[in-house]
């Protein structure tokens, strides 16, 4: 995957100073030399972070799998064909093993198709076709879409805050509470399931005894679709570093409230069942 290169904290701060001084000649720069030195050395990651958000959150590559198995055979009386297929596309996000459930993006498809033709008599042919498919789409929880997450990744400066303060403390500020690390690891997940089932049966009777080539048929078709959305999203709290106390311990200000995980299971209105009978 081609990814753009973004400024590190040192170069971001240096160029920010240049732009500020151009607009405000005679003023003191926003970032002092001490700040620039700390960004460059990385000695104080809590007060002077340098986060490459793209590298920290996105994989350079991911796995896409597709498998197919087909079986066919038969005799003069019956013929059959069966196909099984499976597709799996893993997400591009990097997630920690903090949860018992998957918070990464994932897309899976299972499908099966079966065609059977049976000659009940020398003039009567019965054909049965079956098809089933299930799509499962997993996403990180919360209200932010994939597009919104990418926009956040591309807009966050490298020095805004660390990735986290340990896996249990998501970094952030009052103004910036949408930390991509928190979205991916502390927002729960949502899952969308779309199922399709199709079946058809056709009987064809030859009427050669009346006129050669004449036949009559009857068919029955069934189609059903089901949508199911499972929401297990939750809110998380962010921590803003405020320094060390008298005993040398790190102190933080917290923003937001951790919420209980949602537990909703909804079925879409797009359920469709169609029965179709034909004869001719």
Regions picked out by a protein language model, each given a short descriptive name:
Residues 1-196, 202-208:
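Membrane-proximal, glycine/serine-rich, low-complexity loop/turn segments characteristic
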Residues 87-109, 113, 139-141, 145, ...:
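Small-side-chain secondary-structure face that scaffolds active or pore-lining regions
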